[in-house]
Amino acid sequence: MPPPELTVQPLDSGATFRNQVYRRLKQAIIQMDIYDHPGDVRLDERQLSGLLGVSRTPIREALTLLEQEGLVRLEPRRGIYVVRKTKTEIIEMIIAWAALESMATRLAAERATAEDISTLWDIFRSFEEQAPSDNIQEYSDANIEFHKAIIRLSRARILETLTDNLFIHMRAIRKLSIRQDNRAEQSMHEHRDIIRALERRDGELAERLAREHTLGLAAHVERHGDFLDWLRLAEVRGPDVKAALKDGLPLM
């Protein structure tokens, strides 16, 4: 299995290099499938400098900011690594997300316009005549877009801020787990129930459905997420654990 691809967007003019590099790297890390690869997820300063067309100084400054946020780990004489979480940490993050997103859903029932809510249906329009499992990659992207939209429709900037760093891991775990246990079809059904509750402006029901939906992911990780501890262990213990992963330890 090839390592996750790092796709970095070009810089804009008018902002400091450090801040631009920070934003571009953070977005690139969000888009990586960091739990779908048994090896370390390593970043290379020289490669980043070439991709962004800047010196290594703003790269290092941006990486320091990302390290302070707990997104990367800088190891002297070894390199820069994207931080992956243990099974327990992921479950705790999902529970925190469930609390924040369920509140966002209640607020969306009060604050979102009818047009806003209709855009949630648009996200899944292409699945009206095909099952989500028929195009799992497209559905995975739609699933992630849906959850980001719910937070946005709350009109609560603080919720967007609080969920920002959680989203890096939530996105990767959702993308990985959606392929398992018929979760795509179940997810589609639950999304529709949430949208209908929003249309009825039933904030209490929408909040409960959103919370139960996300806690279902926590239960799934509890059952199938032991590999997360192996991935984390591989980062610490090195080649022996990595070899065990490559020899067939099942990913979720």
What is the meaning of each model-derived region?
Residues 1-106, 110, 226-252:
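Short linear motifs at protein or domain termini
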Residues 2, 168, 172-252:
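C-terminal all-alpha effector/ligand-binding and dimerization domain
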Residues 10-18, 41, 93, 132, ...:
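Alpha-helix initiation/capping motif
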Residues 28, 32, 36, 127, ...:
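A short secondary-structure junction motif
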Residues 43, 100, 122, 186-189:
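Alpha-helix N-cap/N′ positions at the starts of helices
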Residues 60, 111-114, 138-141, 159-161, ...:
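Juxtamembrane/interface motifs at transmembrane-helix termini
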Residues 61, 67-68, 74, 81-82, ...:
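Short leucine-rich amphipathic alpha-helices used at interfaces
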Residues 93, 111-175, 188-197, 205-216:
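Conserved amphipathic alpha-helical segments that form helical-bundle/coiled-coil interaction surfaces
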